[in-house]
């Protein structure tokens, strides 16, 4: 006999957190504009994902064209740096991994200061592959120590940050 599907309550995001996220995305866009790089904001409505992939894929916020290199993707987050590091939601990371795999793109989290300061951190999605999941509250999370993230100042040129991010 087939078990009935149990619907989980949707996670409600605090409006203040939504506003901080929008401010972080705007700050990142202004920084990209100053770099004079081709980039696109990816519209986030549910209709921009094919029906069979809804709930399985997450779109990044920006696609950035690097002349002579190709396309990279950024998911911008307003993040608080905790003593243990940066905390990511496992379900969101898994959905971004699906995006990265299907589109053959390198995806970064651009973790901007939740208070609007110039300090930010880049975390390439694959840096989270070996991070153990830990339950916090009602969801599984990944905590990346801050020294494993790449510090980026929004006052420095994008090109310098990008070169550091791909250096071996």
Predicted features by range, described:
Residues 119-168:
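Intrinsically disordered, low-complexity terminal regions enriched in charged/polar residues
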Residues 100-128:
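Nucleic-acid nuclease catalytic cores
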Residues 41, 73, 108-111:
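A structural signal for short, well-ordered beta-strand segments and their strand-loop junctions
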Residues 1-51:
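Acidic-basic catalytic patches of nuclease active cores, encompassing PD-(D/E)XK
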Residues 32, 60-82:
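Conserved catalytic cores of phosphodiester-cleaving nucleases, focusing on short active-site segments
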Residues 79-102:
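Mg2+/Mn2+-dependent nuclease catalytic core
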């Amino acid at each position: 006999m087939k078990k009935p599907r149990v619907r989980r309550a949707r996670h409600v995001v605090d409006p203040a957190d939504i506003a901080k996220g929008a401010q972080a995305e705007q700050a990142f866009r202004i920084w990209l504009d100053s770099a004079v790089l081709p980039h696109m904001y990816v519209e986030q409505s549910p209709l921009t994902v094919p029906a069979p992939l809804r709930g399985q894929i997450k779109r990044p916020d920006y696609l950035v064209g690097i002349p002579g290199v190709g396309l990279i993707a950024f998911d911008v987050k307003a993040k608080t740096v905790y003593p243990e590091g940066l905390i990511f939601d496992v379900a969101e990371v898994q959905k971004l991994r699906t995006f990265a795999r299907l589109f053959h793109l390198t995806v970064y989290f651009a973790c901007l200061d939740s208070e609007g300061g110039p300090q930010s951190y880049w975390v390439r999605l694959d840096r989270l592959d070996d991070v153990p999941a830990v339950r916090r509250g009602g969801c599984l999370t990944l905590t990346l120590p801050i020294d494993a993230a790449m510090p980026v100042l929004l006052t420095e040129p994008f090109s310098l940050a990008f070169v550091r991010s791909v250096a071996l």
